[in-house]
UniProtKB/Swiss-Prot annotation:
Keywords: Cytoplasm, Elongation factor, Hydroxylation, Protein biosynthesis. One of its GO terms (cellular component) is cytoplasm. May be beta-lysylated on the epsilon-amino group of Lys-34 by the combined action of EpmA and EpmB, and then hydroxylated on the C5 position of the same residue by EpmC (if this protein is present). Lysylation is critical for the stimulatory effect of EF-P on peptide-bond formation. The lysylation moiety may extend toward the peptidyltransferase center and stabilize the terminal 3-CCA end of the tRNA. Hydroxylation of the C5 position on Lys-34 may allow additional potential stabilizing hydrogen-bond interactions with the P-tRNA. Its main location: cytoplasm. It comes from Erwinia tasmaniensis (strain DSM 17950 / CFBP 7177 / CIP 109463 / NCPPB 4357 / Et1/99). This is Elongation factor P. PROSITE patterns: EFP.
């Protein structure tokens, strides 16, 4: 695998650190007036999802992580595992519920997700960036109730809760950004 200097660290790069794969979320190169330059790096441990902040000297380097991002279709959940299938080879990958984590609330049947594999084992699941879900529960918007931000919580068909505008009603289908869990628009 390729070796990356700390100067080459960019968001999205996956590296091996302390024997495990990490994804770099942000990297700030600092060149003090006195002393050696360094990179202040925020990264996420792919096996557990925990975030770590680390300082690397400008002479430090890290090996690229041998991870593969593959597009897999979500099939079903049997309680302990979420099952995904490769669309071309039809190979199935069971993924533990703790690995799926918060992504579970955005999973729809046959949704194409990005699953990160390390040594053939799924370690991360990213749902599609946008999903269309039906609202199953929300308060009715009262006429003239527009003071403040004008939002109300709504429960979606998968159990996720997002803040929506007052005019959105139960039974409507909305588009949601899964990265920020925010309402985008109504679907006609």
């Amino acid at each position: 695998m390729a070796t990356y200097s700390s100067n080459d660290f960019r968001p999205g790069l996956k590296i091996m650190f302390e024997g495990e794969p990490y994804a770099i979320e942000s990297s700030e190169f600092v060149k003090p007036g006195k002393g050696q330059a360094f990179a202040r790096v925020k990264m996420r441990r792919l096996l557990t999802g925990s975030r770590v902040e680390k300082t690397f000297k400008s002479t430090d380097s890290a090996e690229g992580a041998d991870v593969v991002d593959t597009n897999l279709n979500y099939l079903y959940n049997d309680g302990d595992f979420y099952h995904f299938m490769h669309p071309e080879t039809f190979e199935q990958h069971p993924v533990e519920a703790k690995t799926v984590g918060d992504a579970a609330k955005w999973l729809l049947d046959n949704a194409e997700c990005i699953v990160t594999l390390w040594n053939g084992k799924p370690i991360q699941v990213l749902p599609p960036n946008f999903v269309e879900l039906e609202i199953t529960d929300t308060d009715p918007g009262l006429k003239g109730d527009t003071a403040g931000t004008g939002g109300k919580p709504a429960t979606l068909s998968t159990g996720a809760v997002v803040k929506v505008p007052l005019f959105v009603q139960i039974g409507e289908v909305i588009k949601v950004d899964t990265r920020s869990a925010e309402y985008v628009s109504r679907v006609k």
